[in-house]
Amino acid sequence: MTGSIAELIPAQERAIRLSPRDPQVGLFYFRIGFGHLLQSRTDAAIVWCEKARNATPAHPLFRTLLASAYALKGDSASAAAELAEARRLVGDDRYSSITRLRAVVSWGAPKDLVEATYFAGLRRAGVPETDAAAAGVGGGAGPTERQGAGNA
């Protein structure tokens, strides 16, 4: 994502208006939800992240953003369910720790906001800061390529 957070949401809303049946509409919803989460508007983030999940149910990153928002709202059961489904869908260990997730996802948003919202929510959802593989214990080489938010 590029540009300011203030520009993000209107740009995505415009894209949805121009192309409501776009095959990437789930990504537009995700970006709106992410923008709301970064601004600590958790209720709005949940609405848009649920739309993203419903539009693209097999996208694990959409589910982790929703898990984070649910956890920040205090809905630990929904957060745990979304996190478990994201882990099942992704097929690797990127959601095993905050450290591992940082290694594979590039957000293009201010790091302090991502820390205060997305990662804080994932911590509340039960994602540990590190794990044995992420810390280099047990021979895990770790991820080698970074993926953008649309591909994680």
Indicate where each model-derived feature is located.
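Alpha-helical protein-protein interaction modules
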Residues: 1-152
